[in-house]
């Protein structure tokens, strides 16, 4: 390839959405990629789900709805997920999944003018190591140091997180021309970073409800503190295998939880279910898409003390005991009482983190310099 191009490297996005970083990548595809000066090529370091698999999954769900197991909400979900691959990922953006052609994937990295990491692995991989002198930017979605110490802070014997190496995070911060931190607060990383917070668009703005059931729509990694829900009436939307990990490794009692296997396309359906309080007390939370979503859907959150601590909010918890205490206080609130907390919080978050145009322009200044 003789044409000059920049590689944008990711480990997720498109139809592979397992968390906030993948949402960030999809926002980048839609909002940033069309405005890049140098030809962009998106490389996704994963094996994509085939159309046949996606179609089969959708058909199974649709059959369940037709059999009366989904109701009106289910029928609406079916309408939303009848999308093919081209609609999930903008095909005007040249892209390649590593699983489709590993050799070409490697060659494209080698031939790039620059490499911009949108969301990388948290440990070294040869594809990046052998091209690290080309890294122009690296977007940091979570602090490895914080993730690794979460179990100690929470006084837990074991920890659930992806493969991580602190030295790799440090090295990427050193070699990247632009190390970018996306959290709501300034970075506390070892090396200086540029602070470009994510954005969230409030599109639902739903009213609160009087339901005292708790909802949890996050991964089950240790810093998310899912064990705070032990013994509480809860609806949990997450990876079911990871629930098993908590049961088997930390003897977490999940008998009071109603469990739903996470699939991103069903998120809206889950958020509209009958629950009114959000477990959003995730320690070391960088941005917190799930927190923004909870507030957007009218769920009153219990937050961690370290999430936007400058915002005056009474319902915060850093332990199971504190979580139960805050839960009881919220249960005593009237609907109007809940509105008094949710609506001002929504207004603050929208004002502070809701400007997509500002986010886009800041990103483009880095990529187009």
Predicted features along the sequence, with ranges:
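N-terminal strand-loop element at the rim of the active site
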Residues: 11-16, 31, 35-93, 242-243
């Amino acid at each position: 390839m003789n044409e000059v191009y920049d590689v944008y490297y990711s480990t997720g996005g498109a139809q592979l959405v397992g968390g906030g970083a993948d949402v960030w990548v999809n926002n980048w595809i839609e909002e940033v990629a069309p405005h890049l000066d140098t030809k962009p090529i998106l490389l996704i370091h994963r094996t994509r789900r085939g159309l046949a698999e996606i179609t089969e999954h959708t058909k199974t769900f649709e059959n369940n709805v037709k059999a009366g197991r989904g109701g009106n909400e289910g029928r609406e979900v079916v309408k939303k997920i009848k999308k093919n691959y081209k609609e999930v990922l903008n095909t005007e953006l040249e892209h390649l999944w590593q699983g489709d052609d590993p050799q070409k994937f490697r060659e494209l990295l080698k031939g790039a003018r620059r490499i911009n990491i949108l969301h990388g692995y948290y440990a070294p991989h040869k594809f990046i190591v052998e091209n690290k002198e080309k890294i122009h930017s690296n977007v940091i979605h979570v602090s490895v140091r914080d993730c690794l110490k979460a179990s100690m802070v929470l006084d837990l014997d074991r920890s659930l997180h992806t493969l991580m190496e602190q030295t790799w995070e440090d090295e990427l911060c050193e070699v990247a021309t632009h190390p970018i931190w996306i959290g709501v607060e300034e970075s506390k990383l070892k090396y200086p970073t540029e602070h470009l917070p994510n954005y969230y668009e409030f599109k639902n703005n739903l009213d609160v409800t009087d339901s005292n059931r708790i909802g949890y729509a996050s991964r089950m990694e240790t810093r998310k503190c899912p064990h705070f829900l032990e013994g509480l009436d809860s609806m949990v939307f997450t990876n079911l295998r990871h629930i098993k990990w908590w049961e088997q490794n930390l003897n977490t009692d999940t008998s009071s939880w109603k469990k739903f296997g996470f699939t991103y396309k069903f998120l809206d359906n889950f958020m509209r279910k009958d629950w009114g309080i959000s477990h959003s007390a995730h320690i070391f939370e960088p941005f917190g898409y799930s927190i923004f979503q909870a507030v957007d859907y009218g769920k009153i959150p219990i937050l961690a003390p370290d999430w936007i601590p400058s915002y005056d909010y009474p319902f915060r918890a850093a332990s199971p005991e504190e979580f139960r205490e805050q839960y009881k206080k919220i249960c005593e609130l009237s609907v109007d009482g809940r509105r008094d907390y949710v609506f001002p919080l929504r207004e603050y978050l929208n004002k502070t983190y809701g400007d997509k145009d500002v986010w886009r322009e800041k990103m483009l200044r880095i990529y187009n310099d």
